[in-house]
A protein has these predicted regions:
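Rossmann-fold NAD(P)H-dependent dehydrogenase/reductase core
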Residues: 1-233, 308-316
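Pocket-edge positions in alpha/beta enzyme catalytic cores
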Residues: 50, 80, 245, 291-294
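C-terminal helical subdomain
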Residues: 88, 188, 240-287, 294-300, ...
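A C-terminal cap/extension of S-adenosyl-L-methionine-dependent methyltransferases
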Residues: 235-239
Length: 316
């Protein structure tokens, strides 16, 4: 096994330097890893804009963060439903109006284990529409602000990418014929991860080496992801698992995305997360990504389909 480049303890937030005058945009911060990531960034002096679906929860989150860190922190929230292209576009417009640059966009929000096939208002299966198409559009629209600061795009994936079929099911993209909660979640996360490495290829081809794109995952962390969208049985099983040593804290689950957003000279070709117990817990660093997640032909086809479906073209 390859040694962790950050040593025996792996990467930790102690490596983050002062982030004053740095601006971060992060999705899904009202609980779990997103909340912990926002808290740590703010504690280092960063300015943080949170994109969340529920405005009341955003308000409560800001109140909590100020109680912990003080009233002088630079934190704000914009309402955004990642499953709605109209909402994503409106939120992006507000970010562009309020910010002159973005040092890192952290795409943390997701839904998982939706028990029955449901569709977004745009006509896509809900997990694919939220986790993939929603993030694809958000990243494309905010790319100009990220480019201004030679910034980063961080996609929070999942080891679930490797638990389903090993390609994109283009002939039935909404999984009308064989829908399962696990299979569709895996598909959406595979699509997210493939798009990161395809973006890297396109940035390189365009000579835009100043912008970096990273893929990471939180491992098995104590979050509310399954609680908000999984079936009753899935939620019950997860509550039991959270009591075991196979699951780590939400704070530790936030380390991979924080590393990808802040660590200088981090190799963007890596895949980052916990490195023990099948990459579910343990020291954070780079670990193996299965070859099918970097299948260039499939990734290119997915990218072209995503531009067609969303009507969004990246301005590279």
């Amino acid at each position: 096994m390859k040694a962790n480049q950050f040593g025996r303890k792996g990467w930790t937030p102690e490596r983050i330097e002062n982030l004053s005058r740095k601006t971060f945009v992060i999705t899904g911060t009202t609980s779990g890893t997103g909340f912990e990531a926002a808290k740590i960034l703010l504690s280092k002096g960063a300015k943080v804009t949170m994109l969340n679906r529920n405005p009341k929860k955003s308000e409560n989150t800001i109140h909590t963060l100020k109680q912990v860190l003080g009233n002088d922190i630079l934190v704000s929230a914009i309402t955004m439903d990642l499953s709605s292209q109209a909402s994503v576009k409106k939120a992006a417009e507000l970010v562009i109006a309020n910010e002159s640059k973005i040092d890192a966009l952290i795409c943390n929000a997701a839904i998982a284990q939706v028990p029955k096939q449901t569709f977004t208002e745009d006509g896509w299966e809900s997990q694919m529409g939220t986790n993939h198409y929603g993030n694809f559009t958000l990243q494309a629209l905010l790319y100009p602000l990220i480019e201004k600061s030679n910034g980063r795009i961080v996609t929070v994936g999942s080891m679930g990418y490797n638990l389903g079929i090993k390609t994109i099911q283009f002939d039935d993209i909404n999984w009308d014929k064989n829908y399962t909660a696990n299979g569709m979640y895996s598909q959406s996360k595979l699509a997210q991860i493939m798009s990161v490495y395809e973006l890297q290829n396109r940035l390189q081809a365009a000579g835009k080496t100043n912008v970096k794109a990273y893929a990471c995952h939180p491992g098995a962390s104590k979050t509310s992801l399954i609680k908000t969208s999984g079936s009753l049985m899935t939620r019950f099983i997860w509550q039991i698992m959270k009591l075991s040593p196979l699951v780590q804290s939400a704070e530790k689950g936030a380390y991979p995305q924080l590393m990808c957003a802040t660590e200088p000279k981090l190799d963007q070709t890596g895949f980052y997360g916990p490195t023990k117990n099948l990459n579910t817990v343990g020291p954070v660093g780079a670990h193996k990504l299965e070859p099918h997640a970097k299948d260039r032909a499939v990734a290119k086809r997915l990218w072209d389909l995503s531009e067609k479906e969303t009507g969004i073209t990246w301005n590279l």
